[in-house]
Amino acid sequence: MKHAFENLVGDVHAALQAGEQFTLGYSAEQSQFVRFNHAKVRQAGEVSQACAQLRLVRDGRQAEQQVTLSGDAQLDRQRLNVALEQLRQTLPLLALDPYLRLDENAWHSHSLQEHPLPALNEVLPLLEREAGDLDLVGIYAAGPVCRGFASSFGAFGWHQANSFNVDWSLFHANGQAVKANYAGQAWSADDFTARLRQAREQLGFLGRPAVTLKPGTYRAYLAPAAMDEVAGMLCWGGFSAQALATGNSALQRLYNGDARLSPLVSFTEQVSGSLSPAFSDEGAPRLDVPLIQQGEARQRLISARSAAEFELQANGADGYESPCALSLAPGNLASAQILERLGTGLYISNLWYLNYSDLPAARMTGLTRFATFWVEDGQIQGPVSTMRFDDSLYSLLGSQLEDLTQEREMILSTSTYGQRSTGSSHLPGALVKGLTLTL
């Protein structure tokens, strides 16, 4: 795939006219998908696809077009030439772009993460052995994902990474379910087995009589999957330079110095070693960015456009200025001590349907739904009926945060909208002294 991309770059270079500049992005995957129902294979197939994002720049104007690639070198060259000509015709019709900034450095980046992926004849027997008698519904996706970038200034980046993602739910006869996931780059049959057995154990607890709680504040443990939902809300402009400059960030008070989180909280955009490429879709090299350190705001994610508009220094963020590999530093809580340290309170496996109830206060709301359990004296008593929580980040990860787990979970995005995502998060679980349930 890299060779095909290099040929495309050469083709566009050869077709350029005087005064023109270009950037060329490349996305490709070779993925294997398997869908399960009642722990049986119901659908299996492979997807091999590639596309290019061509941007033409001239005289302060820019236009871009996406081109689906066939794998046939001659046909793809023709498609790019057609796209290039259409962009040439479009540019004179556009207004000058006041925030157009191109990285004119001839940087080079190359990353090849070829971790061996499990064979299906290894995954399927394990699944049958551990969950063949259960109502398991889910999807397995695996294979290499590629990203490329090149420009007429000589920049060239290539990223290729193997990964797998098993996302499933175990359904109880009463209609409730346990949702679980196992994903990463280094497959471990033992780790997958442990995750399946943990989900099976939680499924057994769903058969107990439901516990109904009154609205109020309760001690709670948020598992990494639940923390991923909370962290995902912060990615909605929380660290964005544009959102912060215009007053539309949930972390406005934190970055203004008017509030802080617990000293236990340190968030980093950890691109190195992640599934995400070390360059942005805008064509700038990416480095690790400390976002929050010991509860205090540090850097923000700055795209080239925001840098131009607000007179900042770009740091490789893409156009959305959203983290692609968010990492939260671990704490001191051992996994084996979670229930003991929780004592009496809520064990929350997942959160659902999160939204902001008060953006400036970083207050968010959502549902607990399935696999939230009531714990007394370190022992799970039963599932909790669906409840709505409404609480501020400055409480959950601030004044009410008691500890974070020593062990963290690598959570890969399950998004396959158009193509498999390279996004990820690396998160611990969180023990909080108080979580507010409203109804």
What are the roles of these predicted feature ranges?
Residues L254-L439:
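Dual-mode signal for accessory low-complexity, basic/Gly-rich regions
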Residues M1-P277, A284-L287, Q293-E296, Q379, ...:
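Active-site bordering "gate/hinge" segments
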